[in-house]
Swiss-Prot record:
Family (UniProt): Belongs to the anaerobic G-3-P dehydrogenase subunit B family.
Domain of life, per lineage: Bacteria
EC nos: 1.1.5.3
Organism: Citrobacter koseri (strain ATCC BAA-895 / CDC 4225-83 / SGSC4696)
Subunit structure comment from the entry: Composed of a catalytic GlpA/B dimer and of membrane bound GlpC.
Alphabetically ordered keywords of this record: Flavoprotein, FMN, Oxidoreductase
Database matches in HAMAP family: Glycerol3P_GlpB
SUPFAM superfamilies, alphabetized: FAD/NAD(P)-binding domain
InterPro entries attached to this UniProt entry: FAD-dep_OxRdtase_2_FAD-bd, FAD-oxidoreductase_2, FAD/NAD-bd_sf, G3P_DH_GlpB_su
Pathway(s) this gene product operates in, as recorded in its UniProt entry: Polyol metabolism; glycerol degradation via glycerol kinase pathway; glycerone phosphate from sn-glycerol 3-phosphate (anaerobic route): step 1/1
GO cellular component entries: glycerol-3-phosphate dehydrogenase (FAD) complex
Protein name: Anaerobic glycerol-3-phosphate dehydrogenase subunit B
Amino acid sequence: MKFDTVIMGGGLAGLLCGLELQKHGLRCAIVTRGQSALHFSSGSLDLLSTLPDGQPVTNITEGLNALREQAPTHPYTTIGASAVLELAQQAQALLEASGAHLQGDVQQSHQRVTPLGTLRATWLSSPEVPVWPLAAQRICVVGISGLLDFQAHLAAASLRQHHLTVETAEIDLPELDVLRDNPTEFRAVNIARLLDNEEKWPLLHDALLPIAKTCDMIIMPACFGLADDSLWRWLNERLPCSLNLLPTLPPSVPGIRLHNRLQRQFVRQGGIWMPGDEVKKVTCRNGVVSEVWTRNHADIPLRPRFAVLASGSFFSSGLVAERDGIREPIMGLDVQQTATRAEWYQRDFFDAQPWQQFGVTTDDALRPSLAGQTVENLFAIGSVLGGFDPIAQGCGGGVCAVSALHAARHIAERAGGQQ
């Protein structure tokens, strides 16, 4: 099977890269093993929140310039500050065109409220997520009886520190009793599958209405809206106060919705989606990828002109930690890591951990190397890259989006518009 590009990994980076390549008329296939990290994320994307020295980023242009000095191996430094800003704008437009209507601006980050009621700087977030400053003084944080993935009292306690009047309440929906037999089934995603049924909408409205009459804003867990935000908009039109939603513990409804929208758009535009499959081997001859072998296709290789590695970090098994080092399991690519195992971590759990910055090494075009030799038609994108800390620096989603479009640009230029 011949393709212009085979993308190994179906997360945020892989999907955005595929969508961008489709705009240039290239035939793409995505091989994905299972659920991506998006399913376990908040659905919000960070661009750059904090510099390596701990300074918060308030001006993205100045932040990128400072990052170049402090983190010379960061993917943003590799790509270049001006290109990062341009590609971030393109990524935002691509998300919008795919049906993911997110709020935010490249030049100015905003503060979103987290599930614990704290504030976190972010680039893009779902419109139902509350953004600081809140347009209300009297707030009620509402939980659902029996849902352990959201603690209303913790969120309320944090919000009270900002001199707001915050109360808590709990609603009981007997229609959800079918899920209560097994506590592991009483999760936000399973609740959403029931509540997204239009016949159930009035039941949720009736449960929230008495609370809505006593406050200016309701904040509750994001336990509906797997396909779209129709129910959220419907409730906001009918309740006497505004309604905002906070992501729960994983799996996350906003994260799943974002992934599903991108995946459906990729398939709608003619992309080949290979779910439940896994790349087992990549044939590389004279520094060029010629064949990609997957578990399900056995002795039938995929033959791409270009290949993209978007396999994720440790969470997605794109990187594997062993006693003597970190390795990239598909091809054994060169990995940026510390010399000894003792340097992998800091003893304080809440400190920035060095292992978070481990990943494959690349050139300026994001082409990785194998035994010191650059692989000419292979590009690495997303969390598999080294040189950045997605948690401490608040740049995980941004690196995925920007690196995906940077690689897609180089592939499109090399392909020359020829399929």
